[in-house]
């Protein structure tokens, strides 16, 4: 009996030691993950600065190093990679996204938002309610538009909250706006549904809801003031009132003769004037909202130590090739 008790005690002690060892190792790893992420952010800033310093390329496009292209020529990025960079005990992989490939919803007017509802596939009867409600959420007054709502509406909800009456800080604030459903926000493609919260996915499976092949999250951002025609989608170009066929062609032309984005034969728009010439009529109206040079980028910093992985997301603002700063960052 005594031997049995001691055996149990020894087993429990061994288990506790194993747990404490694992926790200690994880705590050490967490510290290293943070430094790996910081190293990744510093390298990201360097990459964006070096890209802007290339005098022959006064634009940002998807055939450049930051976007994943590998360089084999005598270039500042020669021999470098964004994939599996060894740092100490760990590795870092960087994935850049041009934030200005989307339209800033805080400067969107009724026409832009109406076009967005059409692209998303929102019912024509619901669209005016959503458009006016978004504009009422952003504007600073308490006077509702014809089909919009202001603070009184939100204070009467089961879980009351106030109307923002100011620009969105995060695009997810749209989920608080009258009429905006998670499916409209995320989209209903299988990949999009995975981005929903567990409750949103449950609701989506239970309800016979419309299919939205596009979404607010694919069209809009809350950062930057101009859209880069070298990195945006055809749908984003259509928000400017550009004909769908022309928008498709403008995007297809970027890929060059081989039809593959990110290769040497890409036909990028080297200046705003270059893009305006391709657009033709109505190009002057785009001038204040289009720029082939981007200032805000998102970078996903995928860190790995052994079998453990963590991802930090950082938003970086580039004023010039020397003044580059992290706006904010968070762990996914």
Region spans (language model):
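Compositionally biased linear targeting/interaction segments
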Residues: 1-332
